[in-house]
Amino acid sequence: MSNISKETVEKVANLAKLEVSETEATAFAGQLGKIIELVEQLNTLDTNNVEPTSHAIDVSNVLREDVATKGLDRKEVLKNAPDQQDGMFKVPTIMEQ
């Protein structure tokens, strides 16, 4: 049986930059524990005679052929830019050198 503690949930939430309340952390700990128990049940299955596969169903490419097309010209692209300089988008600096 897998035991996920409230502290583990809080640590993972912190690493993922998520805010969770005490109540949510307690609830998530129980829910995650149940999920892990269900996944652990898969380890009991005998898969010796099961052929490895990457997809459960046959997959075929349904995408169109990649064809290069003429793009927008620079003036058309920049006409709605809030700020531009030398024919390029000008954006605020976010990193110092």
Swiss-Prot record:
Give the protein's recorded name: Aspartyl/glutamyl-tRNA(Asn/Gln) amidotransferase subunit C
According to its UniProt record, what is one Pfam family this protein matches? GatC
**Subunit field text:** Heterotrimer of A, B and C subunits.
Keywords tagged on the record: ATP-binding, Ligase, Nucleotide-binding, Protein biosynthesis
Give the function comment from the record: Allows the formation of correctly charged Asn-tRNA(Asn) or Gln-tRNA(Gln) through the transamidation of misacylated Asp-tRNA(Asn) or Glu-tRNA(Gln) in organisms which lack either or both of asparaginyl-tRNA or glutaminyl-tRNA synthetases. The reaction takes place in the presence of glutamine and ATP through an activated phospho-Asp-tRNA(Asn) or phospho-Glu-tRNA(Gln).
For this protein, the record's Gene3D superfamilies field holds: Glu-tRNAGln amidotransferase C subunit, N-terminal domain
Annotated catalysed reactions? L-glutamyl-tRNA(Gln) + L-glutamine + ATP + H2O = L-glutaminyl-tRNA(Gln) + L-glutamate + ADP + phosphate + H(+); L-aspartyl-tRNA(Asn) + L-glutamine + ATP + H2O = L-asparaginyl-tRNA(Asn) + L-glutamate + ADP + phosphate + 2 H(+)
Class of the enzyme per the UniProt entry, highest EC level: ligase
Q: Report the record's Gene Ontology biological process terms.
A: glutaminyl-tRNAGln biosynthesis via transamidation; regulation of translational fidelity; translation
This entry's Gene Ontology molecular function terms read:
asparaginyl-tRNA synthase (glutamine-hydrolyzing) activity; ATP binding; glutaminyl-tRNA synthase (glutamine-hydrolyzing) activity
Q: Which organism is it from?
A: Listeria innocua serovar 6a (strain ATCC BAA-680 / CLIP 11262)
Note the InterPro entries from the entry. Asp/Glu-ADT_sf_sub_c, GatC
Q: What is its EC number?
A: 6.3.5.-
Family the entry assigns:
Belongs to the GatC family.
Cysteines joined through disulfide linkages: none
